Amino acid sequence: MTKQNDKNKKILQVATQLLKSEGDMGLTMRKVATSAGISLSNVQYYYTNKNALLQAIADQYFDDCVTQLKQQTPLESFEQLHMLITSQLNYAHEVSDMCRIFREYWAISTRNDDINEYLRRYYETVFTVICDVLRPLSSDDYTLKTSAALLVSFVEGYSVTGKFMPVESERIASTLLEAVRGSLTK
């Protein structure tokens, strides 16, 4: 790895940590530079402004999520759908740092058009991938899109609220399976 790549990686690591620990308002180019032990001009060489830095952090997390989803082969049975739902709900519980980053981006998107557009494109991609995964189980395009929207929306919301629910995730997964199955087979 080159010195430039090392420096860029360090900037992203420090910026990600600041975003997790201090949120959007605590993430400044100057704090990143100080925490990384490099000059502000070096940080600005790689990222001209905070939006560029936020997008680079998002690229790391969102690309990982999309890559993982794209590895999922199209489902051939509702048993496979149940396993997918269960794994997604469990994953939402296990990846607290990632969820913290997502929640921060959701908040930022309410006041930052660039990040809002970035999230729109990300969820559009996730929706398309989930449609591809569910397609073999669907009776038509309308039910496919409705089911994908239900699944994506629920899993994303569950990543925020799931740990506070007094119901086991397996029970939630079974209930969600029935809702998605009902939507897919209408």
Specify the residue positions occupied by each region the protein language model found.
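Amphipathic alpha-helical packing segments from all-alpha helical-bundle domains
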Residues: E94-R103, T110-S138, A149, S174
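Hydrophobic/aromatic residues within well-ordered alpha-helical segments
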Residues: K7, K50, I57, Y61, ...
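Short hydrophobic/aromatic patch on the recognition helix
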Residues: A36-Y47
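Amphipathic alpha-helical segments enriched in hydrophobic/aromatic and basic residues
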Residues: L19-E22, T28-M29, S39, K50-Y61, ...
